[in-house]
Amino acid sequence: VNKFTDAAGNNNSAATQFTWTYDNVNPTLASSSPADNATGVAVDANIVLTFSENVAKGSGNITLYKADSTLVQTIDVNSGLVTVSGTGVTINPTANLDSAQGYYLHIAATAFDDAVGNSYAGISNSSTLNFISVDTVNPTLLSTSPADNATGVAVGANIVFTFSEAVKAGSGDFKLYRSDNTLLEDLDVTSGAVTFSGATVTVNPAADLTSLTGYYMKVEATAVDDLTGNSYAGINDATSLNFTAADVAAPTLSSSSPADNATGVAVGANIALTFNENVAAGSGNITLKKSSDNSTVQAMAVGGGNISISGAVVTINPTANLDSSQGYYVQVDATAIDDTSGNSFAGINDTTTLNFTAADVVAPILSSTSPTD
């Protein structure tokens, strides 16, 4: 404007120029903490928004959602949970974030204004400001193989731990004890005996387990971590993971009646075999033979009436009595006698392991006299 003229046509005495500046630019979001797509955000962190210019509170809500769109909290911009200082806005949710949880933020379009009343456009989608909180939860043990209190565990079995999340080696040991508290193996988590795959840890002891022996495992509290570094609490007792190895030992013959090489055996005597553990009938025969010519006196099926089993004792009752002063031996098929776990007695297949001689029960007779009758 160069001049002003009044109603009578008079101009102002000097030419003056006036300039007006209009602010019609809305504030924009310059940055945020946490940043969009941030991970590992502290669960107690505030949310800080930094704008392109100084802002003040307007009206409306700031809304925090979980990644699945579950509403976490609606915060009135004029509440004490929102503070404004220059270009910065700090939002302090009432509760801490959940561990390892995804979130996103909505902001009403009228929530923040610049000094002349231009409003920030707001956020109304799930992608402009989203983030994931840090994992603060320790991994837990879901299952083991063998399970706690398991019996019949294969002597060559590995010990497998399955956790609630993917894990990695920390520092420390897995320890295998016998049930009498003898430490058998101390396995460092970084050794080749311990392998990690996802949520699974496999422990491979150097030596096989011993038949029918009890064991338990301990795990140091720093040995297993999740991928964020939270540690599994560990096992420090003898009961949380204990198990018993399978019976893989075949029964053995402890004694017999008659004993090997016995003489003067009663001709009507039964033959009793006593084993080192309880046994049961398998399949096959127990055979009585003469020593003189290896002829078979009787082959008796273990499931037949000539053989009875009680606990660790097998009693053989031949159909006929022994011959007076006759030598005999007993043979047992390798599948004939089993223990209660199905392990078979090795059997007897020779002429010397169990041989004996029957008593002389024949009265002498007069062959001749001198002088003759």
Tell me what each language-model feature is.
Residues 1-40, 63-64, 97-99, 109-152, ...:
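Acidic, Ser/Thr/Gly/Pro-rich low-complexity segments and short DxT(G/T)-type signature motifs
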Residues 43-82, 110-113, 155-194, 222-228, ...:
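Short, surface-exposed alpha-helix to beta-strand junction/turn motifs within ectodomains of secreted
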Residues 87-89, 129, 199-201, 241, ...:
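Short strand-edge motifs at loop-to-beta-strand transitions and within beta-strands
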Residues 1, 51, 101-107, 163, ...:
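Short beta-strand segments enriched for Tyr within beta-sheet-rich domains
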Residues 89-102, 201-214, 314-327:
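Signal that preferentially marks extracellular ectodomain short beta-strand elements
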